[in-house]
Amino acid sequence: MVTLSIAKLNSLPKEERNRIYLTLVPRSIFEHFRINPKTLLNEHGERVVQGIFPTDENLGCIEVKYRHGDKDCIFSCQVSLEAFMQSLHLDFVIINDPSSERYDIDVDEFGRDTLFGTRSRNIPEEIRAMQAGLAPGMVRKGLHLMREFVKCLEIFTGELNLKTITNRGLFYHSAILWEKYGFTYFKGLKVMEQIDKEFRPGGLLFERLDGSTPFRRKGAEQTVRLRSWAIYDGLYADALDEEWESPIMYKMVGKNFEVNTFPDQIY
């Protein structure tokens, strides 16, 4: 079968192109937020599904909002082609509950984009988000649709006649969640296993949970989410003298790898 590049997909007639891209969006989103999957209009008559489909690039982005003028999307996803593994690469996916409280962790006190904490941070908002049960990188609560989304991602991958999906676990908790949905590691498995070992009593990460910051409190080793906040706060770099590097992960369409680098985990 001939692989359909994303650039070629973007060049298809609009109706066919849109049909294929819409397979990325969990059906539950259309149903819950009363968005017509054919007209792409919400109950207020606003077009709330948009995309970016450059015909000269192997990438595409689709997003869904609750109201047209909303700052945050309900759903936003960008995919591209990974030439090395001949796979579909998931650049990012964001799924927000628009009715939940917003935490401005994405902008600092000067209004600059924090770039997921790589350029700057908004500590007060991060503390609020953590206390509300959110993980690093989240501005709102999610909709618990990741399992459904992975199925959508597999359908989309099949439309391109590809068999492999790749992505990066941007945060520690992201990698753990991708494990749960059938992904394994191309790069980073040993690091993830080491992290679990060092978070156990007597480990280097465990010993650094000293309460020196709100993100490094004792007991944080017990959950995926609090481990992730501690690593995001620089605990990994401080304890192991090396920077956290997002693992590269992959999944075969129709196959779930049974990987679990945090046995008996609590999210």
Region locations from a protein language model:
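Conserved acetyl-CoA pyrophosphate-binding loop and the N-cap/start of the following alpha-helix
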Residues: K141-C152
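Short His-Asn-centered micro-motif
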Residues: N167-L170
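Non-catalytic substrate-recognition and accessory regions of acyl/acetyltransferase enzymes
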Residues: M1-M138, I155, E159-L160, T164, ...
